[in-house]
Design a protein with these regions (language model features):
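C-terminal substrate/ligand-recognition segments
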Residues: 195, 229-272
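Alpha-helical packing segments of well-folded alpha/beta enzyme cores
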Residues: 1, 126-133, 170, 240, ...
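A general alpha-helix detector
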Residues: 17, 155-156, 169-173, 243-244, ...
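Trp/Phe/Arg-rich N-terminal binding region typifying the photolyase-homology
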Residues: 1-82, 180, 246
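Helix-loop-helix junctions that connect adjacent transmembrane helices in secondary transporters/permeases
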Residues: 203-240
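Secondary-structure transition/capping motifs at alpha-helix termini
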Residues: 40, 177-178, 204, 251-254, ...
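Glycine/tryptophan-enriched, flexible segments
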Residues: 64-215
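An acidic- and aromatic-residue-enriched active-site/binding cleft used to recognize and process polar
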Residues: 22-23, 50-51, 164-165, 190-193, ...
Length: 274
């Protein structure tokens, strides 16, 4: 991006580049490199807002220190609140597709995931999936989300990750609804909480945030490698673990509760480092 974005700016005579702020270690490094490259051409990189309901760093204790426990974070998060979605649409700006900019190298093909992904991309698909969930899934979300045998989750995680829909849009649609609305909003709060954790403690991307887990047993050697391979292939002999890993291999998706199970199994039962 530090090479291509300045090239696009030069081609279209851009005077500024606006982005949604990123708070992950990778995102900060990437954006810093892009900002430095643009600065040479006198073009500012302007970060506005964030892909979260409440941006990391805004929810703090009375002494301005960050929260380490979710429940008090959640209570303060609700009190801080968030803005309504922007009242804009596809005609609010002149959108530029980089693929249509002449003089750029051809876009690289994404790697083949070797699965038939059943999740259409883009904002239209995100809004359609969200509307379907509101109509057919939200009312039973609080209970059905824990059932891997049911389609009880929203399947919005990839759309949130890649920014095809903003959580403020989701929260606005949850407002005033009963059923699973409260449970779903709490999940959005968990997303904000761990973004805040990563922003405050970036080393948690590589090391245990809770140092008590540094003493957990870890295996190595050929036996550990064989166990890891069996885990990846869904051939551990534990049905729920294997079902989850085979679902991932076959569809590119794994149910949220099963993600917790397979991760816990890898670390606590197979004694392999996450």
């Amino acid at each position: 991006p530090e090479a291509l974005i300045p090239q696009i700016c030069s081609t279209i005579d851009a005077t500024a580049v606006h982005i949604s702020a990123d708070f992950s270690p990778f995102g900060l490094r990437r954006d810093s490199a892009v900002a430095a490259a643009l600065a040479g051409a006198g073009i500012p990189l302007i970060a506005t807002g964030s892909p979260y309901l409440v941006s990391p760093g805004r929810v703090t204790k009375d002494d301005d220190t960050p929260y380490k426990v979710f429940t008090p974070f959640f209570n303060r998060w609700r009190a801080v609140g968030w803005r309504a979605p922007a009242q804009s649409g596809p005609t609010a700006a002149s959108w530029i597709d980089p693929i249509g900019v002449t003089g750029l190298p051809p876009a690289a093909d994404p790697p083949d995931p070797h699965v038939a992904l059943d999740l259409p991309a883009g904002e239209t698909a995100a809004r359609q999936r969200w509307a379907e969930f509101l109509a057919d899934g939200l009312a039973t979300y609080a209970s059905d989300r824990d059932r891997p045998d049911k389609p009880g989750t929203s399947r919005m995680s990839a759309h949130l990750k890649f920014g095809t829909i903003h959580p403020r849009t989701l929260a606005a649609d949850l407002d005033g609804r009963d059923g699973g609305a409260g449970a779903y909003l709490r999940e959005l709060a968990f997303r904000d909480f761990y973004a805040a954790v990563l922003q405050q403690w970036p080393s948690s991307a590589w090391r245990n945030w809770n140092a008590n887990f540094d003493s957990i047993e870890v295996d190595d050697g050929p036996g550990a490698e064989a166990a890891f391979h069996a885990w990846k292939q869904g051939r551990t002999g534990y049905p729920i673990v294997d079902a989850g890993m085979r679902q991932l291999l076959g569809s590119g998706f794994m149910h949220n509760r099963v993600r917790m199970i397979v991760a816990s199994f890898l670390v606590k039962d197979l004694h392999l480092p996450w």
